[in-house]
Amino acid sequence: LPNLYYRWGREDNYGFERTRIREDENELQKMFDLMNAATTEKIVSDTRPMLDFIANDPQAKEGPVGAVGYCMSGKYIVGIGATYPDEFAALASYYGVGIQTEETDSPHLSAHKIKGELYLAFAEEDVYVPGPLLKSIPEKMAKAGINCRVEVYPGTGHGFAFPERPIYHKQAAERHWERMLALFDRNLKI
């Protein structure tokens, strides 16, 4: 997996203590500041060299590629799909934050450029993607006229797919794998 934060340091050396973010609001804010510094524009720019590397790797299968993002990287999925529409055939986002915002560069505004299949999955109870967005995002994606499925996983919270998290939801996590692998199989023939 690429390190989205390479500009700001290396894993476990980003200026906050990851083990303390749940009990120390200052550490949590430092983490959010770092997350906000990694803009969609920067990640989209970083994606081009990765695509070039894959295209030149003799062990990589030729043809379109897929990508998956969780949490904050969910918005990047929309951004890279819109920027590189001829290369991404399958895109999945799980409890993606920031897919639709009030900003002029909100990822949903460029979604109409996506040519591949897009799957957006959300937690039913997500403080970072509140209920009104869960209603609005499907409407925005339908308006974009793209091949997109939006699904809300009932009884889940943000981070439900990760077994090491207290919010882990086994049934939803298994369904998330089923949906992702089916998406890749339809579009990438894995």
Regions found by a protein language model. Give the residues of each.
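N-terminal cap/leader regions of alpha/beta-hydrolase-fold enzymes
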Residues: 1-190
